[in-house]
């Protein structure tokens, strides 16, 4: 019997999840399909009830539903609870359990580009205050980094700092983030600013960026955002979102099937389908 997996979010026109997952299933010899469901916030409740009735085995969750989905689940695990965000839902004995593979997926991509593979005491600036930012901050906290979070809407950054008040974290205005950029070891963009098709935009000005800073962008389409292109021209080490995207997807598949997919196969397919 064909297993059914999928992705819910809005909008989903840019997503490479279906081609990545189906390539992984084929490589694994798994009889499964992965469908994208473009669901607006207003439709979320009805859509979840329909998916449950259809017997879907599991699904991923992306913008803007990572927080709102929690109200419709039977249970969430410890990591998802700490982040207040879910990106993976697993059907276990008829119960829907929320998990979050974004945090581990991101750190697995970041640590190899950090000089000594340690973030302890490193100063990290996170731009954005959505579900992806929650995952990144949770992951950085586990690594004992010193975190600043900044967002266009300052109140949202403050709310995030309060949520993670057990960590070494502060919320700062975006103009302060730009003026103090030279004090950070890692800069991470978790927003959708610069994502296809609006590829000319940047979430922060890099005028005060020091060359030793690692610049990371969770966006994977385009392969190099305007932010990463400028950082690269300045001589900085850069990290795009493909590693995190592949890693979180692979970890989701492990939760659903108990098997490890071929991540190199998944990455190859994503690269092939980028604009």
Swiss-Prot record:
> Which key words tag this protein in UniProt?
Amino-acid biosynthesis, Aromatic amino acid biosynthesis, NADP, Oxidoreductase
- Any Pfam family from its record, for instance, is Shikimate_dh_N
EC numbers: 1.1.1.25
Q: Which InterPro entries does this entry report, sorted A to Z?
A: Aminoacid_DH-like_N_sf (IPR046346), NAD(P)-bd_dom_sf (IPR036291), SDH_C (IPR041121), Shikimate_DH (IPR011342), Shikimate_DH-bd_N (IPR013708), Shikimate_DH_fam (IPR022893), Shikm_DH/Glu-tRNA_Rdtase (IPR006151)
**Positions bound to NADP(+):** 78, 128-132, 151-156, 218, 241
Query: Source organism's superkingdom?
Result: Bacteria
Please name the GO terms of the biological process aspect recorded for this protein, alphabetically: amino acid biosynthetic process; aromatic amino acid family biosynthetic process; chorismate biosynthetic process; shikimate metabolic process
Q: Name one GO molecular function term.
A: shikimate 3-dehydrogenase (NADP+) activity
Q: Write out the catalytic residues in the record.
A: 66 (proton acceptor)
| Metabolic or biological pathway, per its Swiss-Prot or TrEMBL entry | Metabolic intermediate biosynthesis; chorismate biosynthesis; chorismate from D-erythrose 4-phosphate and phosphoenolpyruvate: step 4/7
Q: Which GO terms describe its cellular component?
A: cytosol
Which proteins does it associate with, and in what oligomeric form? Homodimer.
Q: Which family does it belong to?
A: Belongs to the shikimate dehydrogenase family.
UniProt function note? Involved in the biosynthesis of the chorismate, which leads to the biosynthesis of aromatic amino acids. Catalyzes the reversible NADPH linked reduction of 3-dehydroshikimate (DHSA) to yield shikimate (SA).
Q: What is this protein called?
A: Shikimate dehydrogenase (NADP(+))
């Amino acid at each position: 019997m064909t297993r059914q997996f999928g992705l819910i979010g809005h909008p989903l026109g840019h997503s490479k999840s279906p081609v990545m997952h189906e390539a992984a299933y084929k490589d694994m010899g798994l009889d499964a399909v992965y469908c994208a469901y473009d669901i607006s916030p207003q439709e979320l409740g009805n859509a979840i009830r329909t998916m449950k009735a259809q017997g879907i085995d599991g699904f991923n969750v992306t913008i803007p539903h990572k927080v709102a989905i929690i109200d419709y689940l039977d249970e969430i695990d410890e990591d998802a609870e700490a982040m207040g965000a879910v990106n993976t839902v697993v059907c276990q004995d008829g119960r829907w359990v929320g998990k979050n593979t974004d945090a581990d997926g991101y750190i697995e991509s970041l640590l190899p580009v950090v000089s000594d593979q340690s973030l302890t005491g490193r100063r990290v600036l996170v731009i954005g205050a959505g579900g992806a930012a929650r995952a990144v901050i949770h992951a950085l906290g586990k690594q004992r980094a010193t975190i600043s979070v900044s967002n266009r809407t300052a109140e949202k950054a403050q709310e995030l700092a309060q949520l993670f008040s057990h960590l070494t974290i502060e919320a700062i205005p975006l103009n302060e983030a730009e003026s103090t950029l030279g004090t950070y070891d890692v800069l991470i963009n978790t927003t959708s600013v610069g994502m296809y098709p609006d590829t000319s935009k940047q979430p922060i000005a890099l005028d005060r960026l020091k060359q030793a800073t690692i610049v990371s962008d969770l966006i994977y389409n385009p392969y190099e955002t305007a932010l990463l292109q400028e950082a690269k021209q300045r001589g900085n080490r850069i990290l795009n979102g493909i590693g995190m995207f592949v890693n979180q997807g692979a970890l989701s598949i492990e939760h659903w099937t108990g098997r490890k997919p071929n991540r190199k196969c998944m990455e190859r397919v994503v690269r092939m389908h980028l604009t």
